């Protein structure tokens, strides 16, 4: 997509003033549509409405892979929303370079974002050529294995404490009519599971060499071969999932139809909505119980450039609201994510969130792949792992060869 060629059309379209019955209405687009996510979004909307403005919800059903092209098309096509969700990283890079997004540096400076946002890499991901273009709202980590205590009780085995024990328990789960590992059909779920396995099995340094340094030799080497072996185990264990959306896979764990799920901490919102309690109804293993490391992925809001002064002021108000301490707590407790502020009260956090906070405090973190790789490279990864998990005839060796080629060509 050549965004720069479309920029002139958008700038012309926003040159004329917009007319609205209520100039403080602000459309906010996002892809948070599951039950737990919707409850979290409601907290953001409530906080923003309290400023005297009005949150106009622009939820787009489906994953980020479905929503982002729609969001980008609107911005480049001259129909920008007031604010839009993207993940931490490079997803809005071309939009910023094309001059289509607002510079939030003044707001960030007045609100002291550099002093309150932790880790600092989150704000770094919002910064291009020294200017800040987004407001981070949470830290979401992929590195979690969620386990159904009821499923393992039914299968007559102890709840696993790590990935190897989980793999060993798979036959007992299958014998009890339980799918060992729930993975939905959306491509991002398969590639996310692989990335989690890499951190757990190959370690933090190897993860950085492959995705940060884009070292194709390491990607083709023996350490990553072990990861592909584990991915092959995961593929076999997930046979029979037969669901598409991530929250449907989470529901299989909640209802005891599946033993576990590799999924980010946003899954906590679904467990909470179902009235389940961490440690009693389900178990969470950060780093798959092998390497207690979490990624600092998550979400941020970007603000398209508008010429309507009232809406621009509403954008300022929203940016400030997103980082307000009370908003941070209310939103993240329901979202299952960690706040980006290091100075908020999280005494109400559940056991799993407390584990994440402790890991974050220790500094056992890595950047998310969205922060390290371009959207195009991420899409190539998704295509590969979607095929790998769906096609049992693709060998781990063949998949690793293709993976190394993707890393070699990564930008």
Pin down the residues of each PLM region:
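Conserved N-terminal structural module of periplasmic/extracytoplasmic solute-binding proteins
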Residues: 21-98, 110-113, 159, 276, ...
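Extracytoplasmic/periplasmic substrate-recognition and gating elements
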Residues: 24, 46, 51, 155, ...
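Hinge/lid segment of periplasmic solute-binding proteins
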Residues: 89-142, 167, 193-195
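Short, solvent-exposed loop/beta-turn-alpha elements that line the ligand-binding surface or hinge
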Residues: 105-118, 201-226, 273-277, 286-293
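Mature extracytoplasmic/periplasmic domains
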Residues: 106-109, 266-270, 299-376
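Extracytoplasmic/periplasmic solute-binding protein
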Residues: 128-137, 143, 167-213
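Conserved C-terminal helix/tail region of periplasmic/extracytoplasmic solute-binding proteins
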Residues: 153, 359-411
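Glycine-centered hinge/linker elements that transmit conformational signals in sensory
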Residues: 170, 212-242
